[in-house]
Regions:
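Intrinsically disordered, low-complexity regulatory segments
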Residues: 1-169, 173, 179, 467
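Basic, low-complexity terminal or inter-domain segments flanking catalytic cores
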Residues: 2, 81, 125, 180, ...
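Amphipathic alpha-helical transducer elements in NTP-driven molecular machines
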Residues: 9-16, 33-36, 40, 59-62, ...
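Short strand-coil-strand connectors
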Residues: 30-32, 226-230, 413-417, 661
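C-terminal or mid-to-C-terminal helical accessory/interaction module adjacent to the motor/catalytic core
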Residues: 87, 142-227, 269-270
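Metal- or metallocofactor-binding catalytic centers and their adjacent structured scaffolds
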Residues: 244-280, 286
Length: 695
């Protein structure tokens, strides 16, 4: 008998049908000489510190660096702490028996880092010695599964993939466990979660937040003239220069207004080619789904995974935007299939040779770019259909013609002021026709240098400089992809993918972790750090744990392990040294968390004392631990203001707060019924008496 292990029951069911394992048993299917079983994600995990006899957060125990990591069944949280998940333990026993009774194991977990780790951890935990081979496929269509089963690969071919996954798992454990314990011990109150990837990600969110909030907008003035163009159109020139002072701008405006003509000083005409966009990888799909449709990164991943399991798209957790030659041979057939769908029937043009920009064998590693499979997308929800159609539409764009334009730039001088205008004429719409999003630009007449133009009007406008906007999930994913470097070019971004922080498969969960930990929140599409997130970042922002570039280097090292260019032992020694450094650095933060008595009892429990800890005031009763963060809407509360809040339930009317839109406001800070702080505005007070909570 051979045992096939899939990552999920739904995938196991499809494989079982194809191999003839039609008899349903407890935890597996059987028949045709096969047993087809399944995991449900990670059945086995690394033991927590208490698995090594280390309990609680104790300074002398740090850093915790196990000589050998211990594997245990996945745990679930109960009122009495963590215990093995009974369903997981039961499934492990079934899998262990099947493995033992089999002559061969076929590994059919997801074909990627985590899928490999799910199987290998389980295999090692069981202590199995049965030989195994790998089913490595990029879609779950019947055709792909059958071809994969006919061409099974040696299990050891993916040893380096496993070693990279194992190194990532262990490094996250070392940094997360030791960093969190060290910082929490230093703080002396509460738990402050830090991580190898989550902390640098938070640092980027906080840095952008402060850059936005501290930006001072400046006014500027710009001049404009208008003249007749082609076919009755008006061509509007704008001054090349912008003035920071209104007076000199007005002086020049009056001269321009009085001038009777303008002279063309330069006329440039050149052909511009806009390359087709590359196909989607997961991160690019997540970015565009967030920007265009407001989907979260996690939501997009969940939908893509669902579409994959329904056989509608190829493997979603891909980091490549290219396809190999053998897959390119299937593209005409797939485009013809897309063209049969109502949404695309008028958009797909039959071509003997589709554009090859997204074709490159050398840029495809484990999995190629996202494609639809040719299975009909029936009965999809609105959200699922949106993601499916995005992938189909990108395929149509990627294999269409280039967009070609004639671009004209004209410079003219009027009353000593230089003006410019730019326009274009589309010669070949190409891929831009797919969504019809190409804006119509004004056609510039065939003016030549020395031509005289007669202005039909002039104007002066006032503008204001704007800060960089707060991060959205789309822009944060871009920043994670390039370790904070701002790169617009698709090909350059793809070349940097090994230097980013996180991976396409993990970035969504990292972002969600920051929400779950209470470090940031969503405000419409923007990501806003919370008081807790800002307080944490203020402590660690100059430390190695928050170093975005260094985290990008770790990802690069993991990619080298995967390629067989670096030993996992070398990486382990480096990460252990790094762990010792960041643990020492974080535990020395106690000077930043030094506490003093506020002189106030806790308004919530009544038994604890409220103590000042730099950025936060907290109850010293461990069963309560009420926190009050000093930073509120860009303003730090003073000791006296905090004391008013603790004793009266509210402060006096305070000035100098700043809204998320950057506007200043005045408000009272008060406790609500759950002892969360909230703003109360002057108009909310009645008869000069405050109606908020008072202890």
């Amino acid at each position: 008998m051979k045992t096939i292990i899939a990552e999920k029951p739904s995938v196991a069911r499809e494989i079982a049908r194809i191999v003839g394992a039609t008899k349903r048993e407890e935890g597996y299917f059987e028949g045709g000489g096969y047993a087809v079983t399944w995991a449900f994600g990670h059945l086995v995990q690394l033991a927590m510190p208490d698995g090594y006899g280390i309990r609680g957060f104790v300074r002398d125990n740090l850093p915790v660096i196990p000589e050998t990591f211990t594997l245990i069944p996945r745990q679930e949280k109960t009122e009495k702490g963590y215990k093995p998940d009974s369903g997981v333990v039961s499934q492990i026993k079934i899998i262990a028996r099947l493995f033992k009774e089999s002559e061969q194991i076929i590994v059919a977990t997801d074909a990627g880092r985590e899928g490999e780790l799910i199987f290998r951890y389980l295999y090692h935990y069981i202590g199995c010695t049965t030989p195994f081979v790998r089913l490595w496929i990029s879609s779950l269509t019947d055709k792909a599964i059958r071809e994969g089963l006919r061409n099974l690969e040696a299990g050891d071919k993916y040893d380096n993939l496993y070693l990279a996954a194992k190194a990532r798992s262990e490094s996250d454990w070392l940094v997360g466990i030791n960093g969190t314990q060290a910082l929490s011990i230093a703080a002396g109150h509460g738990t402050y979660s830090v991580g190898r990837v989550q902390t640098p990600t938070l640092a980027m969110v906080c840095e952008r937040y402060w850059e936005n909030r501290r930006f001072t907008s400046e006014a500027f003035w710009q001049l404009h003239i208008a003249t007749d163009g082609c076919d009755g159109e008006v061509v509007k020139f704008s001054s090349s220069e912008k003035w920071k002072e209104k007076e000199p701008a007005m002086e020049l405006y009056n001269k321009v207004k009085a001038a009777g003509c303008a002279t063309v000083t330069k006329a440039e005409r050149k052909e511009k080619t806009e390359e087709t966009p590359l196909l989607y990888d997961l991160t690019t799909l997540q970015k565009e789904a967030n920007a265009k449709h407001g989907f979260t990164a996690e939501q997009t991943l969940e939908i893509a995974q669902k579409l994959y399991e329904k056989k509608l798209i190829t493997y979603p957790r891909t980091g490549s935007r290219y396809i190999p030659e053998d897959v390119f041979a299937e593209i005409p057939k797939l485009l013809a299939f897309i063209g049969t769908q109502p949404e695309w029937k008028d958009k797909v043009r039959a071509k003997a040779a589709p554009t090859r920009r997204s074709v490159d064998d050398g840029k495809v590693t484990d999995h190629h770019a996202l494609l639809v499979t040719g299975e009909k997308p029936l009965f999809l929800s609105k959200e699922d259909n949106t993601i499916y159609q995005m992938i189909a539409g990108r395929m149509v764009e990627a294999f269409s013609e280039k967009c070609v334009k004639d671009v004209t730039t004209v410079t003219a001088e009027c009353a000593g002021v230089e003006f410019t205008v730019k326009g274009s004429v589309v010669k070949q719409t190409g891929w831009r026709a797919v969504y019809g999003e190409e804006k119509e630009e004004i056609t510039i007449p065939g003016w030549q240098e020395g031509d005289t133009l007669t202005p039909k009007g002039s104007s002066i406008t006032e503008g204001k400089t704007k800060p960089k906007p707060l991060h959205t999930e789309a822009t944060l994913l871009s920043a994670m992809e390039t370790a904070g470097k701002e790169i617009e070019d698709d090909a350059l971004r793809q070349a940097m993918k090994d230097c980013g922080i996180g991976t396409p498969a993990t970035r969504a969960s990292i972002i969600e972790t920051l929400f779950k930990r209470g470090y940031m929140e969503r405000c419409k599409k923007s990501l806003v750090p919370t008081e807790k997130g800002l307080a944490l970042n203020s402590v660690v922002k100059t430390m190695r744990i928050a170093d975005v570039a260094m985290t990008g280097e770790w990802e690069k090292e993991l990619a080298r392990i995967e390629r067989g260019e670096l030993s996992d032992d070398t990486f382990r020694k480096e990460i252990e040294a790094y762990t010792r450094e960041i643990t020492s650095e974080l535990i020395s933060c106690d000077k930043l968390f030094g506490s003093r008595d506020s002189g106030c009892a806790c308004p919530k429990c009544g038994t604890g004392r409220m103590r000042f800890y730099g950025k936060v005031v907290r109850c010293d009763n461990t069963e309560c631990g009420l926190p009050v963060f000093r930073l509120k809407a860009g303003r730090t509360l003073s000791d006296d203001e905090i004391k008013d809040l603790l004793t009266e339930g509210h402060t006096k009317l305070l000035k100098g707060f700043k809204s998320k839109q950057g506007k200043s406001f005045d408000a009272v800070v008060a406790f609500d019924g759950e002892y969360n702080t909230t703003f109360v505005f002057p108009e909310a007070k009645k008869d000069k008496k405050f109606s908020g909570r008072k202890k």
